[in-house]
Amino acid sequence: VGSEMCIRDSKVSVYPIEEKTSFVVKDTRYTLDSLIRNRKIARHFQGGYAVILRLTVDDYHRYCYFDDGIKSENHRINGVYHTVNPIANDHVKIYKENTREYTLMKTKHFGDALQMEVGALMVGKIVNHDGAGSMRRGIEKGYFQFGGSTIILLLEKDKVEIREELLERTKNQCETKIRQGEMIGKALV
């Protein structure tokens, strides 16, 4: 069970990370460099996977660690809060970025990973409980205050085998609804 990656209730998309990979989070297109604002970290995850977990109002807004290991301090990237309402975005075309926090992790089963929380309007508050130190699978890492938000996991090359159907559905621009405890992928040992 420890070698299976299980996250939380959400709508999931999984992208192979290549040089030009980009994806949309909260109506903003990001490359790995623009998402993390750290080219060295972005390069470290080349060839791996970006797992995007979109939470909606019907999802539980607390999130847990997906494996045991050691974590860094939380790194905050300030953004400008804007609504994710498509009607508002159609009338006011402006550059926007959401506030993000990420944690670097050395996991027991999945190698190096990065977990990022992304907040939006009315969900601007990301609350992470702990600083650097140990982490345990299934223990709450933090929560979003009010409404829907997004969690992004970056995983190293050759460390995890993602369920093929998730990759296929993402390729066809479809999210997959998953539940807490449902397997996303397995560690490659």
Model regions and ranges:
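Generic structural motif
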Residues: S10-V12, D67-I70, L121, G138, ...
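Short, compositionally biased
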Residues: T28-Y30, P86-H91, I151-E164
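Acidic, glycine-rich catalytic/binding loops that coordinate metals and/or anionic ligands
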Residues: L104, K159-V189
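Short, well-structured beta-strand-loop connectors
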Residues: Y65, G69-E73, A132-F144, C174-L188
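Cytosolic, membrane-proximal regulatory domains of ion/volume homeostasis and mechanosensation machinery
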Residues: S22-A50, L55-Y60, F66, N74-I126
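Glycine/small-residue-rich hydrophobic helix-like segments
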Residues: K108-L153
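Short, small-residue-biased leader/transition segments that mark boundaries at the very start
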Residues: G2-I7
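A residue-level detector for short acidic-glycine micro-motifs
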Residues: V12-V14, E73, E117, G142-Y143
